[in-house]
Amino acid sequence: MRALGAVVTLLLWGQLFAAELGNDAMDFEDDSCPKPPEIANGYVEHLVRYRCRQFYRLRTEGDGVYTLNDEKQWVNTAAGEKLPECEAVCGKPKHPVVQVQRIIGGSMDAKGSFPWQAKMISRHGLTTGATLISDQWLLTTAKNLFLNHSETASAKDIAPTLTLYVGKNQLVEIEKVVLHPNHSVVDIGLIKLKQRVLVTERVMPICLPSKDYVAPGRVGYLSGWGRNVNFRFTERFKYVMLPVADQDKCVVHYENSTVPEKKNFTSPVGVQPILNEHTFCVGLSRYQEDTCYGDAGSAFAIHDMEEDTWXAAGILSFDKSCAVAEYGVYVRATDLKDWVQETMAKK
């Protein structure tokens, strides 16, 4: 009673749910899963297929289909007994922001368009930004992490003083912070969460870039809370669309600064940003709406239309511009990718 090609497939939905077929894996005497009927000159082959929840994708060496062998082990032809994993999707917001007109400026209603945006509260209640890049790690600036700490503070000292929210005010616990080994020049730090967050339409990482998106004139988006032009903290989430600026003009604008940030009252904002090979500038003409204090650590998000994916071209480092200065300064994400991936893999 066997026939080649007659196959029964059990579809196991969810985030890697295991097959539970009772003591005898061949026994289908169950009301919810009746034993399949036999056919002439054929047989029933038992298969399971692993699939992932919405906003996750299957990572496996094979195709996710496992067959029960003679030793009653579930095996895949390519992966053997090694099970697949469900990894979080990045850069695929359910409600992406749409550029409906050629206007550079800000909006007060993001409608879940930037699910990677996190809000970080440092000591003494200062609000800054952070960017979700996986279901357990975020990027922010080293300056954000050191707010109200001395320069000698360690990562262990800093972590307990931070409060972090993702999604719609979802409080998450921080396990540790990791500073870039050259953070006085590369203004970046990583935050690891104690638990992985569930990825939803409201909480989703942004992708690290596979290419350089920062050609002058390229338009991207920055989101956050920050301050308005009156330097008051805002309670409403907002975003702004801005172009990548010409780097030479940005350097000239900030008095040719190539040293770490310092007080300089000839600068339009009274302080000099870090400008080096690891940074790029974003902005437009004077007196237009721009980012304000509190948005540092947020991603400059660019939509890759070929891949239909959003990637973080950079992380905002210098954010004291508001409407009085032309340019914000960002750390290039392409320069961070190797360090970020190595750090996440070993920690």
From Swiss-Prot:
Keywords: Acute phase, Antibiotic, Antimicrobial, Antioxidant, Disulfide bond, Glycoprotein, Hemoglobin-binding, Immunity, Secreted, Serine protease homolog, Signal, Sushi. Residues 103-345 form the Peptidase S1 domain. Expressed by the liver and secreted in plasma. Gene3D superfamilies: Complement Module, domain 1, Trypsin-like serine proteases. One of its GO terms (cellular component) is blood microparticle. Residues 31-88 form the Sushi domain. Disulfide bonds join 52-86, 90-207, 250-281, 292-322. Its main location: secreted. CDD domains: CCP, Tryp_SPc. GO terms for molecular function: antioxidant activity; hemoglobin binding. Residues 259-264 are annotated as: Interaction with CD163. Glycans are attached at residues 148, 182, 256, 264. The keyword Secreted applies. Residues 1-18 form the signal peptide. The keyword Secreted applies. As a result of hemolysis, hemoglobin is found to accumulate in the kidney and is secreted in the urine. Haptoglobin captures, and combines with free plasma hemoglobin to allow hepatic recycling of heme iron and to prevent kidney damage. Haptoglobin also acts as an antioxidant, has antibacterial activity and plays a role in modulating many aspects of the acute phase response. Hemoglobin/haptoglobin complexes are rapidly cleared by the macrophage CD163 scavenger receptor expressed on the surface of liver Kupfer cells through an endocytic lysosomal degradation pathway. Tetramer of two alpha and two beta chains; disulfide-linked. The hemoglobin/haptoglobin complex is composed of a haptoglobin dimer bound to two hemoglobin alpha-beta dimers. Interacts with CD163. Interacts with ERGIC3. The beta chain mediates most of the interactions with both subunits of hemoglobin, while the alpha chain forms the homodimeric interface. This is Haptoglobin. It comes from Mus saxicola (Brown spiny mouse).
